[in-house]
Amino acid sequence: MIKKIEKSTNQLADNLAKLEKRLFGTAWDSVVINNKINNGEFVYWVFEQDNQIVGYLAIQKTFFDIHILGIGVLESHRNNSIAKKLTQELISYFEVSDFNKILL
């Protein structure tokens, strides 16, 4: 199931940072993630399975554009179209927004 994250807790931000570190070997600090989600600068979409986050897509909103910060899926859950579904959520969000473009 996909959830859009626009409000965060310390625990959620810590889980997101751990997932990113597990996927890529580096991650935003959980305090930064928490603050930037809660101030509206970052938005995350997460894919949960059995109450565990197994994939995510993160964006940063700027004045006119959306910047994709990262997208990833745990190796054990790949080839199930999770990244595609997360990207479709972003596109739907973009289509009803006032942003000009999506940047990588």
Over which residues does each language-model region extend?
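Conserved GNAT acetyl-CoA-binding A-motif
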Residues: 94-104
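Acetyl-CoA-dependent GNAT
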Residues: 3-76, 84-89, 93
